[in-house]
Amino acid sequence: MNDALHGEALEAIEGIFGDRMKRGPVGEEDTRGEALAVVSPVNVREVELLAEVAGRYSFPLAALGAGTSFDAPGAPGKGILVRFDLMRDVRIRGGEELWVRAEPGAPWLELENNLSPHGWSLAVYPTSAPRATVGGWLATDGLGVGSFEYGRLSENVLSADVVLMGGEQRTLRGEELRSFVRPGDTAEDAAGLVVGATLRTRRADADVPFAAAFDEPEDLVGAIASLHEAGVPLWHLAFLDPGMVRARGLGDGYLLFGAYPEERSPLVEGALQETFESHRGRLLPAAESYRAWGERFFPMAPSLPTPTSAQRTLVPMTELAEALLATRDRSTDPAVQGTVARSGEILLLTFDAQEEGWTRR
């Protein structure tokens, strides 16, 4: 697009957004490249009008999340960034079974806080829930809290309303939705923008946290593999290496923790005890388990700066031991958290504890 068309397109967009448009070139924090402008829509109609202009002048659009993703697509070259901060409406509906509908700018923790008084929870939500938004995490199709039972986020989105390039709005479900959400796409590859999502929920008024300590990484890995192979009906399963355990103020050694519905206790308690004993783990008291559970959002708490050293790796169960050893080669002070999915995939987030200032905690 030549400069004359750039100017024409920007004038059309400014006519839609007024002072909610910031002209560029704009280089947003945690993005790569430069965009022509940033806009902040307040409703779906404005997104449709923006997409019409984008289609007419053939420039890309990219949603700008809350900056919690460590591998999100960058700013589109000669395109427009879309902030959804002003589109954060949350609606809860249903009787015996609830569902929640949210706009892309809604923070995940706000959804949880709205569901909690009803005794319900999201089936899956990110460990960065205090900051992450619905649209931002949906773009990464992540693994998070609840993925041991429910899998990836896209498997738990009942439907999503999207605005395609050109301005058409469609509702996507199932495989069509999963094809639309493709982590790793550049802004230029994006087919459109998510403007709303209906999310799966679960009963959560009697969840039971648990935690176990391990001295050696091979024992931790063995316990994880055993729980997965046995199909123990946990809702969530995660682990920390010694660096992350210290950063969270939870002691030393390796920590395996998670949660399950109380009604499953007859199936779970014995399986946990047997697994931990056979892999030289120590089941921790309830108070310590609840404390570990309460720290599940670290290091994305609102009071802490966004980490700068994170590396995100997805590994199969069979390569976990090797991946944990490799973190020591990349940093003298690694701090690792792992999330286990029902597929056997494990999401590793590796940080440099010294760079983040956690060695002083």
Residue ranges and their predicted role:
Residues 23-25, 213-216, 221-361:
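C-terminal substrate-recognition/cap domain of FAD-linked oxidoreductases
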Residues 30-35, 93-97, 204-208, 250-253, ...:
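Short glycine-enriched loop/turn motifs at secondary-structure junctions
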Residues 23-87, 104, 122-124, 350:
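Glycine-rich N-terminal segment of FAD-binding domains in flavoprotein oxidoreductases
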Residues 1-29, 53-61, 66, 274-292:
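N-terminal accessory segments
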